[in-house]
Amino acid sequence: MTEATTHITIQQKYRSLLKSCKNLISAEDIRLVRKAFDTAMSSEANSQAVTEKDIHRLLDTGLIITSEIGLGRTSIICLMLHRAIESGMLKLEQVKTTFGEKVVQILAGLRDISHIYATHRVVDSENFRKLLLSFAEDVRVQLIFLAEKLYDLRHAESLPPEQQRELVRETSYIYIPFAHRLGLYNIKSEMEDLALRYGEPEVYKEISLKLEGTREAREKYINEFIAPIVDEFNNRGIKFKVKWRTKTIASILNKMRKKQVEFEEIYDIFAVRFILDSRGAEEKADCWRAYSIVADKYTPNPQQLRDWISVPKSNG
């Protein structure tokens, strides 16, 4: 990769970060984020030279925070500044004048939680997990920390095996339960898969190869499965979108171990969702109407049936 190409990539990531930041609406907001970025990159804020890898890490983690977790300007500013605060190269008093009290509070939380993390190395301790998950008053502290760990997991293949194992232990005991607690189910599922990939690489590879080997037949089966429902929904004038996905490797392995069966004996390895476009007052009736159509086409399994219409999940 040439220097020019790298420069363009960094600029593109920075612009993408600004676009994905939902509450970035004014020129002043953009100025503050740019100020935080420039501060993070400056020699005065770093004990050693900033590398291209450092910049990509910062921007990629920022995109996780905005695009995948849904946080905004304040969290991005804190992400950009907290390493300099943690190293002592930048003081909270210096930050307060430019960025305000809320940024200082979150940065103080990040500094303290990093200290706890560095001084409590027994990550599979229940006391440590409770301490870390309940420490900060502002949940954005923990969400920023979570985003950094997700970045580490996504790039764990470059780590030595012992560091990979340590990251897997942390992920299993701390970050997966935390993501679940906050309803970040996509992040939770990805972390479970990545923890399995580096924690049990042979098992992960075996299931991955089997999924790939059955992909074409599975896609054909799913298309045939949803076709009669789609036709009936259209005939009834139901507005909807349909999405389907193969379940995660970690989820499949959990089923195999729970039921003590082989991969070939797991039949529900994909999930289909019909998302209705309904008005609030008609939503419940439309859901029951849709369920009736599906039940007419395919016999429900009472043991696997969950009534989220009458008793919705706590996260809605």
Q: Model regions: which residues?
A:
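Hydrophobic or amphipathic alpha-helical targeting/insertion segments
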Residues: M80-G109, L184
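Aromatic/histidine-rich interaction motifs
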Residues: D112
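Proline- and acidic/polar-enriched loop/turn elements at helix boundaries
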Residues: C78, L107-A108, M191, R245
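Short alpha-helical catalytic segment bearing the HExxH-like zincin motif
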Residues: S75-M80, F145
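Nucleic-acid processing machinery
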Residues: T2-T6, I10-I25, K35-A36, S42-A49, ...
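Short, mixed-charge amphipathic alpha-helical segments
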Residues: S20-A36, L92-K102
